[in-house]
UniProtKB/Swiss-Prot annotation:
HAMAP family in alphabetical order: MurG
Function (record text): Cell wall formation. Catalyzes the transfer of a GlcNAc subunit on undecaprenyl-pyrophosphoryl-MurNAc-pentapeptide (lipid intermediate I) to form undecaprenyl-pyrophosphoryl-MurNAc-(pentapeptide)GlcNAc (lipid intermediate II).
EC number from the UniProt entry: 2.4.1.227
Catalytic reaction equation(s): di-trans,octa-cis-undecaprenyl diphospho-N-acetyl-alpha-D-muramoyl-L-alanyl-D-glutamyl-meso-2,6-diaminopimeloyl-D-alanyl-D-alanine + UDP-N-acetyl-alpha-D-glucosamine = di-trans,octa-cis-undecaprenyl diphospho-[N-acetyl-alpha-D-glucosaminyl-(1->4)]-N-acetyl-alpha-D-muramoyl-L-alanyl-D-glutamyl-meso-2,6-diaminopimeloyl-D-alanyl-D-alanine + UDP + H(+)
Protein name: UDP-N-acetylglucosamine--N-acetylmuramyl-(pentapeptide) pyrophosphoryl-undecaprenol N-acetylglucosamine transferase
Gene3D superfamilies named among the record's database cross-references: Glycogen Phosphorylase B
A GO molecular function held by the record: UDP-N-acetyl-D-glucosamine:N-acetylmuramoyl-L-alanyl-D-glutamyl-meso-2,6-diaminopimelyl-D-alanyl-D-alanine-diphosphoundecaprenol 4-beta-N-acetylglucosaminlytransferase activity
Family in the record: Belongs to the glycosyltransferase 28 family. MurG subfamily.
Length: 356
């Protein structure tokens, strides 16, 4: 089968942690001549982001069931059936050789539709704990991959596909050797920010004084409040931005990152070769804790769960990391990364399509 004849449908939606890895794999296969379409929902980020990346997208109507009332739970089978019918019609038109599920609600009915049409399903789990949809789909998938060990007992560990500009950063030894002056602390709470970071880090800055310089990404609507908090702590010199458009440049600037531990963030930090202080979001299944654990075990990071993320604990942790320690941690982070994750996922997709 030549590259021009191969067709892939990517199923991913909801959050950047699902969509960005899917885009990385899609672009890699498109460069090899594959035709790629996307299955998503019209009210989430993929609706805008995927077409901007030159990929046509089809929509089905589906949403999550967690935390919904009894009426929504009772209607769920009807909604899933309708979404399955929509996905099935889309796949009948496009006739993909293989579908790739990268997570999000859309993968459930999409994967079932593909299976019902005899189209092989390939799954990639980005988190250290498998999501509900992928747990179901794993039973019918031809191939299951995972970014971190432990999500599935026998799945190949292939890492998370990350952006090429992050992979292109100089290695820690080239980037960090010879740096002087205050330790550069990058604080990242995601696009929505993280209240615990926004409230705690200005006080940490006051404790550490001139030994650190901070670049703090506050999240949407948080810039002024966080700037005022730094000023009130007597630390107005630190940089606060609502968003960071060029994360690769921010990683290149930083000596250490203080952040949540979403799957993509953890994978990017490892690929960049950066030490980290992680404060996992308190999911019921502790998903972000399990994402961060491999880097802590590798000696590249420390995890402080949210109740432990106090001014004193954060300040003492950062103060204990001198430049020599940070360089060692950075090299351990890079050593724990899987920089060819995109290629690994793409190769498995190709193998399943060829074996069909």
């Amino acid at each position: 089968m030549s590259g021009q004849e191969k067709r892939l449908m990517v199923m991913a939606g909801g959050t950047g942690g699902h969509v960005f890895p899917g885009l990385a794999v899609a672009h890699h296969l498109m460069d090899q001549g594959w035709q790629v379409r996307w299955l998503g929902t019209a009210d989430r980020m993929e609706a805008d982001l995927v077409p901007k990346n030159g990929i046509e997208i089809d929509f089905i109507r589906i949403s999550g069931l967690r935390g919904k009332g009894i009426k929504a739970q009772l209607l769920a089978p009807v909604r899933i059936f309708n979404a399955w019918r929509q996905a099935r019609a889309i796949m009948k038109r496009f006739q993909p050789d293989v579908v790739l599920g990268m997570g999000g609600y859309v993968s459930g009915p999409g994967g079932l539709a593909a299976w019902s049409l005899g189209i092989p399903v390939v799954l990639h789990e980005q988190n250290g704990i498998a999501g509900l949809t992928n747990k179901w789909l794993a039973k019918i998938a031809k191939k299951v991959m995972q970014a971190f060990p432990g999500a599935f007992p026998h799945a190949d560990v292939v890492g998370n596909p990350v952006r090429t500009d992050v992979l292109a950063l100089p290695l820690p030894g080239q980037r960090l050797v010879g740096r002087q002056g205050p330790i550069r602390v990058l604080v990242v709470g995601g696009s929505q920010g993280a209240r615990v970071l926004n409230q705690t880090m200005p006080q940490v800055a006051a404790k550490l004084g001139a030994t650190v310089t901070i670049w703090h990404q506050s999240g949407k609507g948080g810039q002024q409040t966080v700037q005022q908090a730094y000023a009130a702590a007597g630390q107005p010199q630190h940089k606060v931005t609502e968003f960071i458009d060029d994360m690769a440049a921010a990683y290149a600037w930083a000596d250490v990152v203080v952040c949540r531990s979403g799957a993509l963030t953890v994978s990017e930090i490892a690929a960049a070769g950066l030490p980290a202080l992680f404060v996992p979001f308190q999911h019921k299944d502790r998903q972000q804790y399990w994402n961060a654990l491999p880097l802590e075990k590798a000696g590249a990071a420390k995890i402080l769960e949210q109740p432990e993320f106090t001014v004193e604990a954060v300040a003492s942790t950062l103060a204990s990391w001198d430049r020599e320690t940070l360089l060692d941690m950075a090299e351990r982070a890079r050593g724990a990364s899987i920089p060819d994750a995109t290629e690994r996922v793409a190769e498995e997709v190709s193998a399943v399509a060829l074996a069909r």
